[in-house]
Amino acid sequence: MEEVINGILIREVETKNIMTKSSLPVGGYSVNPYVGCTHACKYCYASFMKRFTGHKGEWGTFLDVKHWPEIKNPKKYAGQRVVIGSVTDGYNPQEEQFRNTRKLLEQLIGSDADILICTKSDLVVRDIDLLKNLGRVTVSWSINTLDENFKNDMDSASSIERRITAMKQVYDAGIRTVCFVSPVFPGITDFEAIFERVKDQCDLFWLENLNLRGGFKKTIMDYIAEKYPDLVPLYDEIYNKHNRSYFEALEVKAEAMAKKYDCPFVDNEMPYGRVPQGHPVIVDYFYHEEIRGTENTGKRNR
């Protein structure tokens, strides 16, 4: 069945298995209750998924709502990391109607899986009741700016303020939270300012560089030329000449920030547990495509 709802083409599809083995450095399983994402982020690495869908519209203009057989043996995933939203956002606006992510969480209760939810939405607070019953669960919000105008240029997801408010609600409910500063836009993202806003309501503070490839490289480079012309030489140096010195300097800056605030500083690790308030683990995830590992503790190839 297909229909257009609020300008988005909605298609309901059947899938044999909602759980997919993950190739991400964080490992485990990837679970995506939808195909497509209506947040329509201009830098979305998952936009490559369009070619597998048969959709002709642009990424962000369609959403496939998955139907899957009920997970009958959730204990099968005990001890495994389960990432919800690796190539979609399980809390896109349409989740309010279709409730696929809530259904998935209900089926995972009692699994003893290490669940990681990745989102840019505040809708996740609706499911705090389920999250508290899931045991090892982490909710991660992508926040790469405090400038709502820049955010609106890049995506149509919840405002930054709504994300920060949702993070505090989930954190105060006793659920582990992550501020995922991703992607870090050179010359635009001020991760120290973001850290100041969220350090008392997150357990991990992840940093990931902007990685330009595929069709969206031109989109972003054209945007920088139009809105931030003074940054064109920097972006040319990083993304055309492949100079890493900018992000190498940011790594040094991040480590210094960790020392200043007495925070652990790690390289692509996701240790479980709550941390003393105001001292989140700062995670260096720059150039993560070089990271390969087992048991979710991949190390960078240096």
Can you name each region flagged by the protein language model?
Residues M1-T138, L146-N149, I160-E161, T165, ...:
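Conserved Radical SAM active-site core
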Residues E2-E14, E192-R302:
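Auxiliary Fe-S-binding modules of radical SAM enzymes
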Residues Y29, V82, I115, V139-W141, ...:
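Hydrophobic faces of well-ordered beta-strands that scaffold small-molecule active sites
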Residues V83-N92, D122-V125, V137-A157, P186, ...:
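Conserved radical SAM core fold
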Residues I109, Y171-D172, K199, K259:
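Anion (oxyanion) recognition and catalysis
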Residues K120, S142, V266-M270:
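Conserved beta-strand termini and adjacent loop/short-helix elements that scaffold enzyme active sites
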Residues N133-V139, K199-L204:
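Glycine-enriched alpha-helix->loop->beta-strand junction motifs that scaffold or abut catalytic
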Residues S156, K168-T189, N240-R244:
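Conserved strand-turn element in the central/C-terminal portion of the radical SAM core barrel
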